[in-house]
Structures are given as structure tokens and as C-alpha cells.
Amino acid sequence: MGKIKELETSLANKIAAGEVVERPSSVVKELLENAIDAQATEINIEVEQSGVSSIRVVDNGTGIAQEDLGLVFHRHATSKIVADDDLFHIRTLGFRGEALASISSVAKVTLKTCTDNENGHEIYAENGKIIHQKPAKAKKGTDIQVDSLFYNTPARLKYIKSLYTELGKITDIVNRMAMSHPEIRISLVSDGKKLLSTNGSGRTNEVMAEIYGMKVAKDLVHISGDTSDYHLEGFVAKPEHSRSNKHYISIFINGRYIKNFVLNKAILEGYHTLLTIGRFPICYINIQMDPILVDVNVHPTKLEVRLSKEDQLYDLIVTKIREAFKDKILIPQNDLNHASKKNKVLETFEQQKINFEKQQSQIGETSAPYVHDQKDKNHDVESHKNNLDSTSSTNNESTEVSNELHNHIDDSYLQSQKEVLFDMEQNTSNEYEISNQQSNDIKGTVSQTPHRRVPYMEIVGQVHGTYIIAQNENGMFMIDQHAAQERIKYEYFREKIGEVTNEVQNLLIPLTFHFSKDEQMIIDQYKDELDKVGVHLEHFGGHDYIVNSYPVWFPKEEAEEIIKDMIELVLKHKSVDVKKIREDAAIMMSCKKSIKANHYLKNNEMADLIDQLREAEDPFTCPHGRPIIINFSNYELEKLFKRVM
């Protein structure tokens, strides 16, 4: 008798379900996608015990016809594709017909549905089989309840992390879906606590205000652009709101949340020197394209996709993000009361914390944006209401957020797009204005230059030979003198190095390099890559190589180190990025040739430095992304000294 046997349907379904239903958030994702595909305008999600006990998703979409109910829990039964060619023109979020079959294989599922022309029906399934089907009262749309997840696969429960972590992953999914579909009213409730409620206004920035808080939302900058194949829309937050991981980067293609290394790299390249190493932006990028240019049928979770013309999209993202910040004032507002505010927010959060039985795990920063940033949102909205002496109750928070956004409108975008967005730079044109007479009366000040992003300021002095202190009518400024000159010199060296061709400089004494046998084989294979950039390696016997010349733009004292870096790139990536090498060289030279800490300057030298900084293309961060200027507002100074409460 043969050893190979066909698995029973129930066992095969459980195995297949492992690919689709990894955890409670997987169930929420699949049901939410189905509701969106059903053209719902309102979706309500309720979970208990982070979805382990129950998950309920109610929508007002088209509903499921009675004649189709018998197939809803069958594997590969779908209304979204019919022929092979449909796979290359997918515009729906779901298409495989696996979700409900997989969920019903590992949970108890009750589905109520009603269409426009029929009465309601209820169907109940467990262990992948329909137990009963009957008429039932139901509103138009679909109501799905998933109970006792993994009840028949207890081994899977062992891999469920803390309830806080699982809730974080659920809120992450819901938040991202809400951002990509702002026209849908979406609410999320966990154990009776409302975690998210969007108003369905169609404005993504209002959804981001709900998720990240008003402080971040007011510093969002709109981006938009087109190529022959792609249309790009999105919001990018100012660098001061950066985070310590990539979790806050949200990329969507045709409304589908995806993860893509190349597009992530494009976003970081767009911010370029505005972010320090290890910091990542908050951003929302939505890309519309012909479905034939993207393959979403790569992975069961549909998170990974393959893109055509990826380079074109990369360049578009980089260009639009750089353009977004080109004319913006990016001086971070220092919060002198950050510590006390943080403590108050933490206290508030502790009081509102969801009561999970016997759960003591902490929320990590990698949990959902809601869990991480809701604290800031609660505080920001509350403090803003206090500033306006608002009498609105906290129950109207969604209305409060929506109303606040309408007070910050970018008129130019309103005219072109007929949408309401934030005025990302409200009053920046006159925020730092000062009369010509005042400018002439002040000695030892930096001259005012029109159309420059660095504001007028009067030099006051220097602290520890490191930080320049300046002031204007709006407050006090601290300038890192090393970072300021580093930015100035970086832009100078970047331009000069960029102008130089691959003309080489011959050496009297060659540089010698030794490699292992494995490295030697790679270098011999890819030596042409080094030749293209002016580094000519010659075999010198054994495992030794010599270099008799290198490009004239190499800094003489760093030439050997740069060549080593190039060779490392060849060994690791089988290629050399000349642009990056030149960039790194400019950064290296600017850092070494800039004034250091504990270097005391005269007032006129400080003024000259600020004047030069004003002429810089990006005057707010050094090449490594560290801030150059920090602003202390008059209000914050007065608050520090208890002059205001």
C-alpha cells in the first residue's frame, strides 16, 4: 500500500489557514478588506481580549446574495476574479477566496448579511463546515462575528504574544486601512473602549490627526506628483517628528498597504540629510497605477509586491519629498516642559489603560501607531482646547479634530485640488518679520536677507565655545556652530566634487592592498566596476594588488580609506555607487574642516556664520541629520519662569 495519501479537507484547510490566519490581526485585516471591497461607507470593528475571544466586523456594503451563501466558506470561491487574465488587473484588496475558508477552519464564525433586494440570512460555520443556515433580521451589509479563535488548534495559541501586543497589531492594521480609505467611517472598539473613530470626510490628514495627534498633523506637508505610469499623493511629517523605527512609514499601492525595501529607501533618500542615522519619518504615500504594473500575487498576506519600472517610482518619491521641504522652515520648537508633560500624559494613559485580565506586558514602540501616539493625541487635543477656551466635551473629539484642521488651510492647494488640507506653514511668511529700522538700529546682528528660511536674529553670545545664542521678537535661538559650518562646507564640497570628472591623479608610491583567496576571485570578476570610477587595481603577485592612481576628487588624506570602502562595496554588493561615494567624501571633508566645540568666536564671526548659513540650500540640519538651530518661544521661556501658567 502506498505511503502518499491525500489529506482530508479539514486538515488541508487548517494547514492552508496557517498562511492566511497567523494571529487575530490577520482576521481583522481579511474581514476589513472584504468590507472595503463590498463598497462599504461605514465599518465598525469590535474585539474582545485582543481578538482571541471574539472579533466582530459590521459594514453597510452590498451584502452577500442568498444564492452565494453556500460558497462563502469554500476555499478559492470568490466574486473578484474569473479568468487568468484577471490576475493582472486586480483592483480589489482580496481576490484569492481563501479568507473566510481559512478563518472558519480555526474559529467559530457567524455571518449575517442582507442585500438591497433580499431579506436577511444567517449562516454559522466551524471547523471549515457550515453547521446551519437560516433567515434572520439583518441590515443591508454584512455582520461577521469570529469567536474562539484557534479553539481547535491549541498549539497556535502558544504563539500568541501578550494581549497588548496583539491589540497593537490590530490597531496597526485598522489605522493604515483608515488612512488609505478616509472616505469610509471606520471605528475600532476593544473591550468597550473606543480606540479609533474616523469621520469619513475623505481627508487623509484628518485621519492622521486621529492617529498621530494634532501636533504631528499640523506639521504634515502634502506631496503630489505624476509620471507617465504613476500618480503619487501623500503626506510627510517634518523631520522633528521622526521615530526610532520604520513602523511609521505607510506605503499604499492602489489602496493596498504594502512593504517594499526600495520604496522605503526612496523615502529616506528624500529626507536625506534631514534625519539622523537611526531615525525614520512619519509619512503616508499612496501610489495609483495600472494594476498590470504590479504583481500582488506574491505572498498569502499580499504585503509583498513586485513592481515594474521601480526606478521611475523611486525617483518620483525622492523628488517630491525633497521639493516638499525645500522652502519650509524646519527649526524645531524646543519644549522646555517636555518631561512634565510626558509624565502627565503617561498618568492619563494609565488611567485609560485597557484592563486585560492578568496581563502585565508593556507596550513596545513597535506596536501600532495608535498605541504609541494616542497619548500625544489626547494631550495635544486637550491642550489646544484649553488654549481656545473651548467648552466642547471630550466626547466630541472627532469633531474637535475636524474643526481644528479646517482652521489650518493651505489655500493654494484648496484651489487646485478642491480639498481642505492643513496650512502646513501658517504665518511662516511673516512670523519672523522685523522692520528695516529695527535692523539698522541693532549692532552685531545678522543682516536680513529676503526669501531666506533662516529668520532674522540678533547675536547675543556664545555658550561653552560651542553654541551661539541669538534672539528676535519671537524668542531665543541656539545654534550649533560646528553643525552650521559643517552644513555650509558640505554643500560647497558636494558641488565641487560633483563637478569633477573621473580624471585620475597618478601616485609616485602606489597603495598596496591584500585580499583573501575568496575576495580575490570576486575582485577579479568585478574589477571593471572599479575601473569605471577611476580606481585601477593591478595584480601584484599572490593575493596582493596595487593602485597607481585614483580620481582627482578624492581627498588626499582620505584616498586610501575611500578606496577600501569602494572595494568593500564590490565585495558586498558586486557594484559601486559612485554618487554615494562622492556624497560620503563631501560629508567627511566638511566634518573635518569645520570649527569644533570649545572654539570661541567673536560677534562678527558668529554673524558671518549665520549669514552663510542663511544662503544654504538646507540650513536646518547638518549632513548627518542633526539639528542646527533650536527655537525657544517667548511663551516657553515665560512658562519656565512661571510668568505664565
From Swiss-Prot:
Gene: mutL
Keyword terms, alphabetized: DNA damage, DNA repair
Region (Disordered): 371-403
Source organism, top-level taxon: Bacteria
Family as reported in the entry's similarity comment: Belongs to the DNA mismatch repair MutL/HexB family.
One cellular component term from this protein's GO annotations in UniProt: mismatch repair complex
InterPro entries: DNA_mismatch_repair_CS, DNA_mismatch_repair_MutL, DNA_mismatch_S5_2-like, HATPase_C_sf, MutL/Mlh/PMS, MutL/Mlh/Pms-like, MutL_C, MutL_C_dimsub
Compositionally biased spans, kind Basic and acidic residues: 372-387
Family annotation (SUPFAM superfamilies): ATPase domain of HSP90 chaperone/DNA topoisomerase II/histidine kinase, DNA mismatch repair protein MutL, Ribosomal protein S5 domain 2-like
GO molecular function, one term: ATP hydrolysis activity
Protein name in UniProt: DNA mismatch repair protein MutL
